[in-house]
Design a protein with these regions (language model features):
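Glycine- and aromatic-enriched membrane alpha-helices
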Residues: 1-469
Length: 469
């Protein structure tokens, strides 16, 4: 008689807590992006993140989870009808990973795993918004988010984690989303930024962060929630979850030091924006590697990622693309660093699943040669090309139909007022309706975005200011 399915209380509670932690990351991202942005666009910046929670959650329940984690059809997507939203699953019997030989799987109800992966999809879409602040119509953003999630994120999640071509055939490693989340979102961010073009006045006018305490608060919430993102991706309560947890902390802390070192050397002044951005860069880089490398390699990864990303944010000035809040410089570059790091430092001495389950190889410095490094590079290239190409086509089509780029006069007025009829701050001297010098000082309704701004150039712009615009 086959064994009856049994829920594992420890695994289920851990994944529920991790889901809540990852959900918290999107409001944290809204605060982080909102603080980095100019005051006259802070609410729109936050709206793009909060709208992603609403839209992507429903899409994931209805068909996204099926496309990502349904039975593999051809290596490119899962069976769309496998977990269609019209179906109902029993918590006591429908357990994730269950097989005839192991009817309990990991002992976690299917709906818990669905919710955990749902919040990954949400924040991946929200990340893209940082590249197009102040100039994207809200309706255009919603259409783009719908199309990109459907055509890119859901299939790519299947390629990486659902038994598709990257995880199942190429045997590339990605513990929590370096390829599926960060390279994916970063490539899309670059494409949309190119289609929409530069903000008015960029880079001649300084576009500094309007609220640095908000940036720090958002970074802190991201750091806190990322423990669920990374350690939760083990799905079970075991030693690998502990490894992912400590590696996340070590890499992030080291990345703060790496970013600040670059600021200190280049600009002679370490900044709070730099520390916050360094933390995010470290979190991004450790994401694919947290459960596959030793702690010492995580520290080294953090230092490298913090320093390289601090330098990478300057590329937009040299190459002329307006990635407003440095999604490319932090998420795309950081995702690539972390993914390739696995080809050097992955070892089954800390996680036997590397060879026993995934079918991957140890990294170069653990005797595996360059095999895994090549696999990681191929996986990253596939996702980069697909995400960039589809995002560019979607953004171009939206611009030519309903319009994606905000009108110049609306951009000058401020996207919060133009698109949402509200502003983040009531700074009028009378406490009332709007004009006045206090608004100008806050960058609301002024072309330059702030009083007293200075011209920017790639030679003179401090690293901390490049992060913000």
């Amino acid at each position: 008689m086959p064994e009856a399915p049994t829920i594992d209380g420890g695994n289920t509670v851990w994944l529920l807590v991790s889901t809540a932690l990852v959900l918290l990351m999107t409001p944290g991202l809204a605060l982080f992006y909102g603080g980095l942005n100019r005051a006259k666009g802070v609410l729109n910046m936050m709206m793009m993140s909060f709208s992603a929670i609403g839209l992507i959650s429903v899409l994931w329940w209805f068909y996204g989870f099926s496309v990502a984690f349904g039975t593999d059809v051809n290596g490119f997507w899962g069976d769309p009808g496998a977990y269609l939203g019209t179906k109902t699953f029993m918590a006591e019997t429908d357990l994730w990973g269950a097989t005839a030989e192991n009817p309990s799987g990991i002992g976690v109800p299917l709906y818990v795993f669905m919710a955990f992966q749902m919040v990954f999809a949400v924040i991946t879409v929200a990340l893209i918004s940082g590249a197009i602040s102040d100039r994207a119509k809200f309706a255009g953003w919603l259409v783009f988010a719908f199309g990109w999630a459907t055509l890119v994120y859901f299939p790519v999640a299947h390629w990486v984690w659902g038994g598709g071509i990257i995880g199942g055939d190429i045997h590339a490693l990605d513990f929590a989303g370096g390829t599926a989340v960060h390279i994916n979102a970063g490539a899309a961010a670059l494409a949309v930024a190119l289609v929409l073009g530069k903000r008015l006045g960029w880079p001649r006018e300084g576009m500094k962060p309007h609220n640095i305490p908000l940036v720090a608060l958002g970074a802190g919430l991201l750091w806190f929630g990322w423990f669920g993102f990374n350690a939760g991706s083990e799905l079970t309560v075991d030693s690998v979850a502990g490894l992912a947890f400590i590696n996340t902390q070590l890499a992030t802390a080291a990345a703060v030091l790496g970013w600040l070192a670059v600021e200190w050397i280049k600009d002679k002044k370490p900044t709070m924006v730099g520390a916050s951005s360094g933390a995010v860069a470290g979190l991004v880089a450790i994401t694919p590697a947290c459960g596959f490398i030793a702690p010492w390699a995580s520290v080294l990864l953090g230092i490298v990622a913090g320093a390289v990303c601090a330098l990478a944010v300057s590329l937009k000035y040299k190459l002329g693309y307006d990635d407003s809040l440095d999604v490319v410089g932090v998420h795309f570059v950081g995702g690539w660093i972390g993914s390739l790091w696995l080809g050097l430092f992955a070892t089954n001495s800390v996680n036997a699943a590397i060879t026993d389950v995934v079918g991957a190889s140890d990294g170069l410095f653990y005797g595996g040669g360059v095999t895994q490094l090549g696999r990681q590079a191929i996986a990253g290239l596939i996702v980069t090309v697909w995400s960039f190409g589809i995002a560019w086509l979607l953004a171009f089509a939206i611009e030519k139909t309903i319009g994606f780029r905000l009108k110049p006069e609306a951009e000058v007025e401020g996207i919060d007022l133009a698109e949402h009829a509200e502003s983040g701050y009531d700074l009028s001297l009378a406490g009332g309706s709007g004009g006045g010098s206090a608004f100008a000082l806050a960058g609301i309704g002024t072309p330059a975005g702030a009083a007293g701004t200075k011209p920017a150039s790639d030679e003179s712009e401090p690293v901390s200011e490049k992060v913000a615009g």
